């Protein structure tokens, strides 16, 4: 299997993405290929950057934010930038997000601004690169679990529609997105998370009773869980650099083979990428505490 990078991912079974047209699977999950999205750190800059493809990441390492090297597809700049909030009072009062995710948007220089609150990173006679607030993540810690609510200022959605739940003393995370339920499954000794779709017959993932979660489906026919994405640190840079790859997200999607830049990433892939960026940050925080 090869990602959008054109590089072999070495283990076809470990990093496979399910591609199916079965009517038991939501149509939005009928994928034609996978997108390999590096997550990187930039020396002197807080947070982590998510790139739309390996090619885009490789180009950025050479050009940084040099607008003269951009093309109409937006190859060579990050897609997202996730940072942790240090507003202590805001966290106590729950009036401030715990994480912010910013999105880079490429426009023609003659195009009107898409958002009133945006930061122009650079521009020339053809393109303008802007940075906007894309997602706010609020953490709600309870005794048995921590809930992460994703709020997209540019979208209208009911509360809890975009959410990740992490139960205490467990590494798996369960998410809700567009009415679908997913599980980021990881083995105890690994940092390789597999993103799996959960069908309708699965018991409520927020139930903390392990025995209840493992109860059989009582003979109902149901679609099997199947893998639609991965988070892995296998391909990260060993030695620190000015721009260092920390991990990869491999996400299934339906798109054209040459969809490499920030302008052609499907909405669903972007939403999964936000979840993957949060997972990366949470693992970083765990390692710093040890």
From Swiss-Prot:
Organism per entry: Saccharomyces cerevisiae (strain ATCC 204508 / S288c) (Baker's yeast)
Localization (cell): Cytoplasm
Record key words, sorted: Cytoplasm
The protein's name: Uncharacterized protein YOR385W
Main location: cytoplasm
GO CC term, one of those recorded: cytoplasm
Note: Present with 504 molecules/cell in log phase SD medium.
């Amino acid at each position: 299997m090869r990602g959008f990078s054109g590089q072999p991912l070495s283990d076809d079974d470990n990093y496979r993405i399910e591609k199916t047209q079965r009517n038991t699977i939501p149509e939005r999950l009928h994928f034609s290929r996978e997108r390999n999205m590096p997550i990187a750190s930039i020396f002197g800059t807080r947070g982590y950057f998510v790139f739309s493809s390996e090619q885009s990441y490789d180009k950025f390492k050479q050009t940084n934010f040099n607008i003269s090297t951009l093309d109409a597809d937006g190859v060579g700049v990050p897609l997202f930038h996730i940072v942790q909030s240090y507003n202590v009072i805001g966290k106590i009062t729950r009036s401030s997000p715990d994480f912010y995710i910013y999105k880079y948007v490429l426009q023609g220089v003659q195009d009107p601004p898409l958002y009133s609150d945006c930061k122009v990173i650079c521009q020339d006679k053809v393109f303008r690169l802007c940075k906007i607030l894309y997602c706010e993540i609020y953490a709600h810690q309870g005794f048995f679990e921590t809930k992460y609510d994703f709020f997209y200022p540019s979208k209208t959605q009911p509360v809890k529609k975009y959410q990740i739940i992490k139960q205490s003393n467990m590494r798996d995370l369960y998410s809700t997105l567009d009415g679908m339920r997913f599980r980021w499954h990881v083995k105890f000794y690994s940092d390789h998370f597999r993103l799996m779709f959960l069908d309708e017959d699965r018991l409520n993932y927020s139930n903390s009773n392990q025995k209840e979660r493992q109860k059989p489906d009582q003979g109902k026919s149901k679609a099997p869980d199947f893998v639609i994405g991965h988070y892995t640190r296998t391909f990260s840079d060993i030695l620190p650099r000015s721009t260092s790859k920390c991990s990869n997200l491999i996400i299934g999607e339906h798109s054209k083979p040459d969809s490499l830049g920030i302008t052609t990433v499907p909405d669903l892939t972007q939403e999964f990428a936000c979840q993957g960026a949060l997972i990366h940050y949470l693992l970083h925080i765990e390692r710093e505490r040890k």
